[in-house]
Amino acid sequence: MTASQDFVVKDLSLADWGRKELDIAETEMPGLMAAREEFGKSQPLKGARISGSLHMTIQTAVLIETLQALGAEVRWASCNIFSTQDHAAAAIAATGTPVFAIKGETLEEYWTYTDQIFQWPDGEPSNMILDDGGDATMYILIGARAEAGEDVLSNPGSEEEEVLFAQIKKRMAATPGFFTRQRDAIKGVTEETTTGVNRLYQLQKKGLLPFPAINVNDSVTKSKFDNKYGCKESLVDGIRRGTDVMMAGKVAVVCGYGDVGKGSAQSLAGAGARVKVTEVDPICALQAAMDGFEVVTLDDAASTADIIVTTTGNKDVITIDHMRKFKDMAIVGNIGHFDNEIQVAALRNLKWTNVKPQVDLIEFPDGKRIILLSEGRLLNLGNATGHPSFVMSASFTNQVLGQIELFTRTDAYKNEVYVLPKHLDEKVARLHLDKLGAKLTVLSEEQAAYIGVTPQGPFKSEHYRY
């Protein structure tokens, strides 16, 4: 990046390819296109300066251009070192949008690019964050705490924290007071995924959340669609592109049976694998059993599994002791947000052979090997291209509505985590029905009164479980 070049992409010449795919994606993203139609004239995001940290894919490019069509200024980075689609990043950079994203970033590059989404040419701060996983939010909040004199940078717990803390110190030295000023300018954050939402709720519980947040993940039209149906298509896609393995007849273990785990188990079962599930939650375990999956412990299943996938959002789900028990050439991957579900750090002293980008063969001292996908990071985005456009349209329409809500009605919200109201959730679903040829039945006034709703909805209570 030069002084006159406010972007970092792999190859700007890929922009034409990216634009062609972006044009196709728009036809599969009716929610975002409807948002442009509904809000384009009123420009509700005029004045918004959005720092976006979310996988820089073709689908995200459509989101970015939707935010801009509604009046926002945007700076963008990917929220994962492997998830960028370089042609998508090039297409966005070619329009003059500052984007900092390359497939296969180092951790140093990743945190430098995260810093760059807050560095506006006029020196003024961002006033909105659009986040996926919480890294952009945590970057600002940890930095502000360090500026306040808290000892938060002296004891990194991982290689990633070492790099993060170094980047914070670098910015503090270059721009004293930057983090505090930036934190105080934020009107709100919209958070895409389970992991990031958990971080926000922890901050709220500790009284450390300095601005309102909208939990996009728990919109029904996100968690029950993106997390389930998206994973149902993209997990097997990532494993196939990474390994070309025949999945029919193989034993696959899915660790976790939340929404992502449910979609992942169905994905593997649909490919013909014999699927087993591990769970800590008795309700989810019972669901898995009654959906026809054998519920096991990883300790018991380790030696017979051909494919093992983590979906939990927790740490140390697959330990080095588990991996020592795995079969020769077992495929190991993760579709949760961070790389700590698998103890990848414990493998670093073993023999690694890079087969191709995001596919590594790791050999144990006894000669046994495992295939690790995307170094334990999101394999559906590292080894493939993530979820299809249609399901991401629902998720990203929620993001757009959340950004509008927090930017235009900031004073209506306390420094807490909120979920979009039911009528907006139903609106997002409604916008996607025509594309699938689905037609809604309309309640009569009498029918609506009988169940205590209006013919236009909302049709379910806030606590209804879909």
Curated annotation (Swiss-Prot):
Pathway: Amino-acid biosynthesis; L-homocysteine biosynthesis; L-homocysteine from S-adenosyl-L-homocysteine: step 1/1. NAD(+) binds at residues 193-195, 227, 256-261, 279, 314, 335-337, 380. Substrate binds at T57, D132, E192, K222, D226. Its EC number is 3.13.2.1. PROSITE patterns: ADOHCYASE_1, ADOHCYASE_2. CDD domains: SAHH. Its cofactor is NAD(+). Binds 1 NAD(+) per subunit. It is an enzyme of class 3 (hydrolase). It comes from the Bacteria. The keyword Cytoplasm applies. Keywords: Cytoplasm, Hydrolase, NAD, One-carbon metabolism. May play a key role in the regulation of the intracellular concentration of adenosylhomocysteine. NCBIfam families: ahcY, PRK05476.2-3. Belongs to the adenosylhomocysteinase family. This is Adenosylhomocysteinase. The lineage of its organism: Bacteria, Pseudomonadati, Pseudomonadota, Alphaproteobacteria, Hyphomicrobiales.
